């Protein structure tokens, strides 16, 4: 059963509940490493929680009268980048972003080659001009500096549902639902299976 956000005190080795966010289905959580915890819910938008005060300091919720707000309260993924921009991945509503947390959102697009509207966004990595976006319908690579946009779907991918993406040592590690993990090389735009061990004959993680 959904429990909302649960806090674990390392020193006391005990669990406790945080304040109510109006929705106990938590889809993503991260922090700035200092004071603020960023929380995405599947039903009540985005919340910024003060770790010290245990209070919500800011929230983004869908409002039909606000054309510059987030377009859905069903949030699948959330990122606050090092420039203070808030990136919000929705269920079947694309990817929103807000410059410098000013509360004004717009759908991410790189016209005319890519538009995230109507995509169900599950994961993404933003590295300035280079972005990798995971959805329920495959993987998208966008390089705004070179003008390169490429999509990957089955059978090139082991699964079209991309749950998580991580950049490490020049490559993107792609976690799929039911298809194990793959590795994307941004230089060659090639995908390979992530294999256990150091030899190419090792079994793929499942």
Regions found by a protein language model. Give the residues of each.
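Carboxylate-rich, polar loop motifs that coordinate divalent cations or form catalytic acidic clusters
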Residues: 1-206
């Amino acid at each position: 059963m959904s429990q909302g956000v649960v806090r674990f005190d390392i020193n006391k080795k005990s669990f406790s509940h945080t304040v109510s966010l109006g929705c106990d289905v938590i889809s993503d959580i991260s922090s700035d490493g200092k004071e603020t915890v960023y929380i995405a819910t599947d039903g009540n938008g985005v919340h910024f929680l003060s770790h010290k005060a245990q209070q919500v300091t800011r929230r983004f919720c869908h409002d039909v009268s606000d054309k510059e707000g987030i377009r859905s309260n069903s949030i699948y993924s959330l990122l606050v980048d090092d420039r203070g921009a808030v990136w919000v991945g929705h269920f079947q509503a694309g990817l929103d972003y807000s410059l410098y947390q000013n509360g004004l959102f717009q759908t991410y697009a790189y016209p005319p080659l890519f538009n995230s509207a109507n995509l169900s966004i599950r994961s993404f990595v933003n590295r300035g001009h280079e972005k990798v976006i995971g959805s329920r319908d495959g993987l998208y690579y966008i390089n705004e500096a070179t003008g390169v946009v490429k999509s990957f779907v089955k059978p090139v991918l082991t699964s079209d549902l991309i749950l998580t993406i991580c950049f490490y040592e020049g490559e993107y590690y792609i976690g799929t639902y039911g298809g194990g993990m793959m590795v994307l090389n941004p230089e060659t735009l090639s995908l390979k299976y992530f294999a256990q061990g150091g030899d190419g004959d090792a079994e793929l993680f499942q």
